[in-house]
């Protein structure tokens, strides 16, 4: 009877479906000509409907028809005229076309709950497919890269390779394309340790987008939590996409890189009461969805998509945890980024980090071993939960993004918070015993401006989305450097390039886990569109034809990543401890903060609302950790100089107690100049809106950590 879903054993296929409200369930098998054969299933126990069919093979397409009460007012939406996807389908064929038959109500009378739409949806919906679970993984293993050694690259399967001329045309925009040797070599050379894929669970292409000639490019509209999205397959949709995905993961593991999935367990593609009936609604609506108390025809929505999964339902929780385990054990992925993760913690009204979902994940021997990253907010009351997740989780740090953007556009009163974000956001995470890796630092992501657009546009330009430029965030914390959009003015373009270098340097030399939005390292632009969720075209795809400036930015970013990875003081496991009142003035702390005169910053400096510069000393000799060889970690010392002023500032380097000789290793104003040497107390100019990094000339006395 178990497991749920369709299980091939070499001789036939076992089908199992959970539905508490069903009065009858039919298994529907489809042949090559779409002729349907219906087989009645048996409810054995615990509301699981079962059938074993000998002689069936992988590639067999199927669906379910569920007979039961249709009473939307009370949250019951069974309709046997709708062919339903298996919630546990491992592969899904096709997509939906927006036909009226997909809906349980009639378009002419959408508010008439008693009038059930009896049009058959089989010809207009997706079909589940049986897969062959056997795959030659060889000696594949999870890389298990430490959090603090990680550099994450957010990528889109299609957007990463659709314009990549090094990838064969027939596999561009697919799992196979993403696994092509030149793509993996590019990421490896860049210094990436993990690729984080935007949603690849089977999702729906919404009919309202299709009508406008657009598509659901981002994929945050899941309908199949076990099935890799079929449109990203170059080999087929009846299970071939599963093997293609596995081969991709295997290729990344062979290169020593991890694969993290962006997963959307907070809602499904069935939308609100006006949405289609594709799977869960028709199987057991009230067991999967959170309904409005006292008004069960409507869905409680904290996601902005029309529905939210019912996180206090054992069956919804089982679906999610079974899915997570499947992707780890069978598909070999290395972690998950949870979209709108605050919704997963809502057993009732409030976000609760002691919720059943977190308890289950924490205790699960499989899920708890991989990387868990939260988008720590949703659209509900009290949904902004940055810093509020359990200790085993990392979080997208939205406050990091906002603060770094504000600092580099010279917003008042940003210096103290900017300093905290650089050091791993201890104010957000240390209070409950977490470490710097709780913070996934990012400046840009798929949602919003690209790095290039962040320095090129003050306003969003989303006209191509067909919503009158009303969609997307209006407060982008961006600065166009004086001209809106593309320009031929050399000074403006030079400043934009420098601002991108400044932000990359900030990101990659901050404590925590850096995440790069794919294509930012080559100055990808979306032409000012900050909500390109529906743009499956050149607006979203990365253009790999690199001019001189884009090649130079790529080389610069790669240099910074490798600097970070080579020096443990730049990605510590634990928070820095600074100078405390009463400490010996001759003691050299783990971190020290200086003004431009070389004096230790005092309270007046921190409270200066128009201070946009500082100098930071990082003590590489005081890392309270051991390396892989069991030796105490010792690294070079570093000085970081930030100047977000519109004028140059002369900085006096610290006295010789902090180091006698220094080598300039990064200068965002002159990134290609040869390294210069400086001595303690010397003066160095930080040009307007620039960043400098100096490294001590001394060599570590013991091996550094890997």
List where the protein language model places each region.
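Carbohydrate-interacting/catalytic domains
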Residues: 1-153, 158, 487, 492-497, ...
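Conserved, mostly hydrophobic/aromatic
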Residues: 17, 64, 155, 197, ...
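Short, flexible loop/turn elements at secondary-structure junctions
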Residues: 21, 43-45, 55-57, 68, ...
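Core domains of carbohydrate- and sulfate-ester-processing enzymes
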Residues: 68-137, 206-221, 275-300, 415, ...
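Short catalytic/ligand-binding loop motif for oxyanion handling, primarily in non-cytosolic enzymes
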Residues: 71-75, 161-163, 203-207, 267-270, ...
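Substrate-binding/active-site clefts of carbohydrate-active enzymes
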Residues: 121, 156-332, 340-363, 383, ...
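Hydrophobic faces of well-ordered beta-strands that scaffold small-molecule active sites
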Residues: 151-153, 195, 259-261, 336, ...
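Conserved alpha/beta catalytic core and glycan-binding cleft of carbohydrate-active enzymes
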Residues: 353-518, 523, 531-535, 568-575, ...
């Amino acid at each position: 009877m178990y497991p749920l879903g369709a299980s091939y054993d070499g001789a036939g296929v076992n089908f199992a479906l959970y539905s508490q409200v069903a009065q009858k369930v039919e298994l529907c098998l489809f042949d090559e000509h779409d002729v349907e054969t219906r087989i009645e299933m048996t409810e054995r126990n615990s509301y699981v409907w079962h059938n074993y069919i000998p002689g069936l093979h992988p590639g067999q397409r199927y669906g379910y028809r569920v007979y039961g009460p249709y009473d939307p007012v009370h949250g019951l939406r069974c309709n046997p005229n709708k062919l339903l996807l298996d919630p546990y389908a491992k592969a899904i064929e096709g997509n939906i076309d927006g036909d009226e038959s997909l809906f349980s109500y009639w378009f002419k009378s959408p508010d008439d709950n008693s009038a059930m739409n009896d049009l058959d949806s089989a010809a207009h919906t997706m079909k589940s497919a049986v897969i062959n679970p056997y795959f030659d993984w060889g000696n594949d293993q999870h890389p298990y890269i430490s959090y603090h050694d990680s550099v994450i690259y957010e990528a889109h399967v299609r957007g990463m390779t659709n314009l990549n001329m090094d990838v064969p045309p027939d596999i561009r925009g697919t799992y196979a394309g993403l696994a092509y040797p030149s793509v993996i070599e590019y990421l490896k050379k860049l210094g990436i340790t993990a690729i984080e894929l935007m949603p690849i669970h089977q999702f729906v292409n919404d009919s309202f987008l299709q009508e406008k000639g657009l598509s659901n490019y981002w994929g945050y509209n899941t309908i199949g939590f076990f099935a890799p999205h079929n449109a990203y397959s170059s080999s087929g949709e009846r299970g071939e996409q599963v093997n293609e995905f596995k081969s991709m993961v295997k290729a990344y593991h062979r290169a020593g890189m991890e694969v993290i999935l962006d997963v959307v367990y907070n809602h499904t593609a069935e939308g609100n009461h006006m949405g289609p009936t594709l799977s869960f609604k028709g199987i057991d609506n009230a067991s999967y969805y959170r309904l409005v108390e006292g008004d069960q025809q409507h869905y409680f929505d904290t996601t902005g998509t029309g529905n939210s999964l019912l996180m206090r339902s054992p069956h919804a929780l089982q679906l999610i945890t079974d899915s997570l385990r499947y992707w780890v054990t069978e598909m070999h992925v290395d972690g998950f980024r949870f979209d709108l993760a605050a919704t997963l913690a809502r057993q009732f009204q409030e976000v609760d980090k002691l919720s059943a979902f977190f308890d289950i994940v924490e205790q699960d021997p499989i899920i708890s071993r991989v990387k868990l990253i939260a988008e720590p907010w949703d659209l509900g009351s009290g949904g902004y939960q940055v810093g509020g997740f359990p200790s085993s989780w990392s979080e997208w740090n939205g406050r990091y993004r906002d603060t770094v953007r504000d600092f580099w556009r010279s917003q008042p009163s940003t210096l103290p918070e900017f300093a905290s974000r650089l050091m791993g956001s201890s104010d957000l995470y240390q209070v409950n015993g977490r470490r710097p890796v709780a913070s996934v630092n990012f400046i840009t992501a798929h949602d919003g401006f690209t790095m290039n657009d962040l320095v090129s546009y003050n306003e969003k330009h989303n006209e191509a989305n067909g919503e009158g430029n009303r969609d997307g965030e209006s407060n982008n914390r961006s600065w166009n450097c004086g001209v809106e959009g593309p320009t031929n003015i050399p000074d403006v373009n030079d400043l934009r390039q420098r601002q991108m270098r400044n932000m990359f340097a900030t990101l990659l030399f901050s404590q925590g886990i850096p995440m790069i939005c794919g294509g930012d390292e080559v100055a990808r632009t979306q032409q000012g569109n900050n909500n390109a969720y529906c743009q499956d075209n050149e607006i979203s795809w990365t253009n790999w034809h690199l001019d001189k400036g884009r090649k130079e930015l790529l080389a610069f970013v790669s240099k910074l990543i490798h600097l970070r990875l080579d020096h443990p003081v730049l990605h510590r496991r634990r928070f820095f401890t600074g100078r405390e009142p009463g400490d010996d003035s001759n003691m050299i702390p783990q971190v020290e903060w200086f003004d431009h005169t070389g004096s230790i910053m005092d309270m007046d400096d921190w409270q200066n609302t128009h201070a946009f510069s500082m100098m930071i000393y990082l003590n590489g000799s005081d890392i309270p950790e051991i390396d892989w060889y069991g030796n105490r970690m010792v690294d070079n010392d570093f000085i970081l100089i930030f100047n977000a002023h519109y004028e140059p500032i002369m900085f006096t380097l610290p006295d010789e107690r902090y180091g006698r000789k220094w080598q300039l290793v990064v200068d965002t104003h002159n990134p290609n100049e040869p390294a210069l040497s400086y001595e303690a107390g010397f003066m160095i100019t930080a040009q307007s809106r620039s960043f400098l990094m100096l490294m001590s000339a001394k060599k570590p006395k013991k091996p550094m950590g890997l």
